[in-house]
Amino acid sequence: MLKTLRFGTRAFGQNLNIAKRNFCTRYTNDHEWVTSLGSQNYRLGITDFAQKQLGDIVFVEIPQIGATLSQGQPITVVESVKAASDIYIPMDGSITTVNQELESSPELVNEEPMGDGWIVEYKSSKTDQFQSLMNKAQYDEYIKEH
């Protein structure tokens, strides 16, 4: 009985952690999503709405690790059968990790845009810039209007 309780507590704790992580995702007017990973680290990708608009993704330019960018600068390019689209960094930051899987499997952006299709991770101390982005409800309303 004690082991079951301990397992249940861990499982419950994981569920809370997942919910907390979803709460920390913000969205841009350019249809990018940003998730706070803690310790001033963030993960960036494009939204499901964006990948549907682009169509089949055929290439993702892998940015340079260590590159320092200002809010609003292009961070990479995503190419699809329809168009090439710049992806912008929504906060001042420095790239720490890139999703190398996208070099050989750019379709991950279509298949799991908010999962394995993430593009970069970066470090930023500009939490005010993160907080100024849209939450999920605001973003859902935004895409209805546009």
Swiss-Prot record:
Residue ranges of every copy of the Lipoyl-binding domain listed in the record: 41-123
Compartments (UniProt record): Mitochondrion
GO cellular component terms, semicolon-separated: glycine cleavage complex; mitochondrion
Pfam families the UniProt entry points to: GCV_H
Cofactor(s) recorded in Swiss-Prot or TrEMBL: (R)-lipoate
Matching PROSITE patterns: BIOTINYL_LIPOYL, LIPOYL
Keyword Mitochondrion belongs to the record: yes
Major subcellular site: mitochondrion
One example of a Gene Ontology biological process annotation: glycine decarboxylation via glycine cleavage system
Alphabetical keyword list: Lipoyl, Mitochondrion, Transit peptide
PTM sites of type N6-lipoyllysine: K82
Transit peptide feature, positions: 1-30
Cofactor: binding details: Binds 1 lipoyl cofactor covalently.
UniProt KW Hydrolase keyword: no
Family to which this protein belongs: Belongs to the GcvH family.
Function: The glycine cleavage system catalyzes the degradation of glycine. The H protein shuttles the methylamine group of glycine from the P protein to the T protein.
Name listed for the protein in its UniProt record: Probable glycine cleavage system H protein 1, mitochondrial
Organism: Dictyostelium discoideum
